[in-house]
């Protein structure tokens, strides 16, 4: 039976509501309470070298800043990850994983830059990170483009490849179409993730369909506290 991992991305996706200004005590409180909840993966914010360091915000210019914000936390989940919107954080601002508080990095990108973004994912993997390739606007991909992307995924073998329903356009059948393409063609070592949005009030239905589908791969499903995130 394949494994299911829950990824909490409140401190990252929730930041679209408050420009990532949660306040340091709230940041660490959310982090430690999500650890207590049993979530296997916690995403702690964006890495974006266009933004200055601010201990009260979960958008950080480099990996060292993650340690400065979270380093005193007593508890930690099995995996801590950050997110990079491809093109917004240079490799020189990413420490080797062994020197970093992070275990993994998720990279979001649109299909027209899939080749450049997947090469960036390969460089992050060389630094020792578990890399998640996040397919923004999954509904923009044709089946042929999905197969092109899967070719890159199978070459690089990231930790996971994830469907991102950026505009909340999927319904369960539509989502499962993309999922089945991934499940049938991605190497067994690569996990498959799903990040839903609730524009048409279908996020919960889509997540249930994703979780209940018979599958060959381990999967990762995203969630936030109170559904906090980008509308």
Which residues does each PLM region occupy?
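Acidic (Asp/Glu)-rich catalytic clusters
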Residues: 35-36, 66-77, 92-102, 118-128, ...
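Conserved, mostly hydrophobic/aromatic
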Residues: 14, 34, 105, 161, ...
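Catalytic alpha/beta core domains of metabolic enzymes, predominantly
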Residues: 160, 164-231
């Amino acid at each position: 039976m394949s494994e299911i991992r829950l990824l909490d991305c409140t401190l990252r996706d929730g930041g679209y509501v408050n420009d990532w200004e949660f306040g340091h005590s709230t940041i660490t409180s959310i982090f430690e309470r999500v650890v207590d909840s049993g979530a296997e993966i916690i995403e702690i914010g964006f890495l974006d070298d266009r933004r200055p360091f601010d201990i009260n915000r979960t958008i950080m210019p480099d990996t060292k800043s993650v340690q400065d914000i979270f380093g005193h936390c007593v508890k930690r989940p099995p995996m801590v990850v950050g997110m990079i919107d491809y093109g917004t954080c240079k490799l020189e601002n990413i420490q080797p994983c062994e020197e970093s508080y992070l275990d993994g990095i998720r990279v979001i990108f649109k299909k027209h830059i899939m080749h450049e973004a997947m090469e960036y994912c390969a460089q992050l993997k060389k630094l020792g990170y578990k890399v998640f390739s996040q397919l923004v606007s999954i509904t923009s991909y044709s089946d042929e483009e999905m197969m092109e992307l899967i070719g890159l995924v199978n070459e690089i073998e990231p930790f996971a490849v994830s469907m991102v329903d950026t505009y909340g356009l999927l319904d369960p059948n539509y989502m499962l179409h993309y999922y089945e393409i991934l499940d049938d063609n991605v190497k067994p070592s690569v996990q498959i993730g799903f990040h839903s949005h609730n524009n048409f009030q279908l996020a919960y239905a889509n997540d249930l369909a994703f979780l209940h589908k018979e599958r060959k791969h381990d999967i990762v499903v995203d969630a936030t506290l109170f559904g906090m995130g980008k509308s």
